[in-house]
Curated annotation (Swiss-Prot):
One GO cellular component term noted in the UniProt record for this chain: membrane
Name assigned to this protein: Protein ROH1D
Family per record: Belongs to the ROH1 family.
Bilayer disposition of the protein: Single-pass membrane protein
Sorted UniProt keywords: Cytoplasm, Membrane, Transmembrane, Transmembrane helix
Biological-process GO terms, alphabetical: mucilage extrusion from seed coat; pollen development; regulation of growth
Summary of the knockout phenotype: No visible phenotype.
Gene: ROH1D
Tissue expr: Mostly expressed in mature pollen.
Assembly: Interacts with EXO70C2.
Function (record text): Involved in the regulation of plant growth, and modulates pollen development to ensure male fertility. May also affect the composition of the inner seed coat mucilage layer.
InterPro entries given in the database record: ROH1-like
Length: 397
């Protein structure tokens, strides 16, 4: 259904509920210019959320779950969060009254649980960087052969031994990431968070810090954290909508968006106890519901593909990483010496392919990590502002 039809559908259902309440209940709130303006804001919020998810859902299969696409998803969350923040601020007089004060506080408490997901995703980014370093060793093993600018010397057995050893280490590392208890890295206590003061970390070397310092405990579970975020999340009933003058709708919308974004991050990036068993069931009369459910189904279908079933992350670049390194490993294992000219050319072509993938990852991970960090800090700031608004009101009573 086109976004305009969703908009009209939601607008009619919401306004009809408001008008029916005004007619049928002598105790109903008088329809004031403030309420009329608020209704327009709520419908506008639904439309903007829908536009974001329609755009995300329009991405091709090749683009879905790429670093660029996941970054776009985070941009969408930040945009929705800012719109939601405006609604909370503009209508604080209603937000601070029961039951809205409880509902808004509940959303912000759920958002706190998303902070651990952000930190776990940051850990996953660092894990991918460790894989990059191993790929660099493989590339250097074949490129650093003293050929100089005049030409390249034939590849020797020593280079293949070094590459083979590194590729095996890479394969084991990627397998270990699926089971955090078997990973030597995860045996270290995880203690890093986006919220920590950089000055406190100044004395750690980058290499040591990245390989041994983490942000969530060994017992932490991404699957359980997602379940906690979505626990008891229910679609607002008609009576709830009228009782809150419709303000429950953006709270439900923002909570669902938060849950979906965190779920998609866990699906894409390596982290502890990844699990996609989160229930989404958004009614179609929500403008954004169709697109969000379609994206959910597409990601689930991607996870069911034969070549993706045992992956440590559905990120497109991880899939390319796994595929390319596996092919390289098979090629290295198949060579016989003396090396034929044809086989050497094939090896060099594969090394060049690894180099391009390495460069793409290098250029994509930093911007992605910055966006995850921005989401983390935006959640913290929004929660502080929101709870402060509710707290100040109750304190003045």
């Amino acid at each position: 259904m086109p976004a305009t039809e969703y908009q009209r559908s939601f607008g009619r259902s919401f306004l009809n509920l408001r008008r029916d309440t005004a007619v049928n209940s002598v105790e109903s709130t008088t329809v004031t210019p403030e309420l009329t303006q608020m209704e327009a804001e709520l419908v506008s919020f639904q439309r903007k959320v829908a536009e974001r998810f329609i755009d995300l859902n329009a991405s091709s299969c090749e683009d879905l779950l790429s670093l660029e696409w996941v970054g776009k998803l985070l941009d969408s969350f930040l945009s929705c969060q800012e719109e939601f923040r405006s609604i909370v601020i503009n209508h604080r007089s209603m937000i601070t009254k029961p039951p809205m004060d409880r509902l808004v506080s509940d959303y912000f408490e759920r958002s706190v649980k998303a902070l651990d997901v952000c930190n776990a995703i940051r850990d996953g980014v660092e894990q991918i960087r460790q894989w990059q370093k191993l790929i660099e060793i493989v590339i250097c093993a074949f490129n650093n052969n003293g050929g100089g600018s005049s030409g390249k010397r034939p590849l020797g057995e020593g280079q293949f031994r070094r590459a083979r050893k590194t590729l095996i280490e890479l394969a084991i590392g990627m397998l270990d990431e699926k089971d955090s208890s078997s990973s030597s890295v995860s045996s270290q206590h995880r203690n890093r968070s986006f919220g920590r003061n950089k000055e406190q970390l100044h004395h750690r070397t980058i290499g040591h810090f990245r390989s041994l310092s983490w942000s969530v405990s060994r017992s932490w579970s991404a699957s359980k954290q997602l379940q906690a975020i979505g626990n008891n999340l229910a679609t607002p009933r008609a009576s709830d909508i009228t009782a809150t003058n419709g303000l429950i709708v953006p709270v439900y919308t923002m909570t669902t968006v938060l849950l979906f974004v965190m779920w998609a991050l866990v699906a894409a990036i390596p982290c502890q106890d990844r699990g996609l068993q989160v229930h989404f069931n958004v009614p179609r009369n929500y403008q954004w519901g169709g697109s969000l459910m379609s994206l959910h189904d597409r990601i689930i279908e991607e996870s069911k593909k034969r070549e993706r079933k045992n992956t440590c992350g559905l990120l497109k670049e991880i899939h390319q990483f796994e595929k390319t390194s596996r092919l390289m490993n098979e090629l290295v294992d198949s060579v016989q010496f003396p090396l034929s000219e044809e086989k050497e050319m094939e090896v060099r072509e594969r090394v060049e392919e690894l180099g391009k993938l390495q460069e793409a990852l290098k250029n994509g991970l930093d911007p992605f990590e910055r966006k995850v960090r921005e989401v983390f800090h935006r959640i913290v700031r929004s929660r502080t502002e929101g709870l402060d608004t509710v707290g100040k009101h109750h304190g003045s009573e």
